[in-house]
Amino acid sequence: WMLVLFGLIGMTACRQDTPRFRIGVAQCSDDSWRHKMNDEILREAMFYNGVSVEIRSAGDDNSKQAEDVHYFMDEGVDLLIISANEAAPMTPIVEEAYQKGIPVILVDRKILSDKYTAYIGADNYEIGRSVGNYIASSLKGKGNIVELTGLSGSTPAMERHQGFMAAISKFPDIKLIDKADAAWERGPAEIEMDSMLRRHPKIDAVYAHNDRIAPGAYQAAKMAGREKEMIFVGIDALPGKGNGLELVLDSVLDATFIYPTNG
């Protein structure tokens, strides 16, 4: 999609003799998945004269992301790309930018409104459904599952849970026995998983909403001497040190599902 966008920008630049086209990117967080997306955006922009890109990360903070979007509006950017940290808190600020006439592209995460120009992202409901079917099959239709979600107010976390529940609801002997918000991060995942292990003597599978949550859950289980009792499934499937593909090869994860960065 960025190729089409920059193609249109390039044609405009040829006709108008280099008015700069400024793009502001308001990222919700700062992690390996986001780094890959940012690199893809910057790499594509390099092919077009007169295009500048500035990227700001909110560090998983709604207030900081609202400040970032206001900053880009004040700077008079020509296009805003936003990955909303949480849907409800970010809806008013995205609507404000859109109503000022700034084209707004939402990437990966949605808001609770249709006041934006375009949305680009994977089908999180379908990813959750696929994970549910995979785990149900791996457990042969019977077992206890715990779920460690991304930030609960973000649309990917909502949709990944909904799709997962739709899948496992077809298996009466598959039970979701616990669920906690791990905020997309390893540290909270380890803490929440430790609590779950204390509450539940039998856990057969861990559904982690991304590949940072999954190793945190695994580490907690390993510290309790229970990591071999259950399978761990994540989402992202990035290559590289400590990422999902390596975790599968190292037998930390049973599987990881691809979630494209769309940069």
Where are these regions (language model features)?
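A residue-level marker of the well-folded mature domains of exported/periplasmic proteins
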Residues: A13-G263
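Bacterial N-terminal signal peptides
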Residues: W1-G10
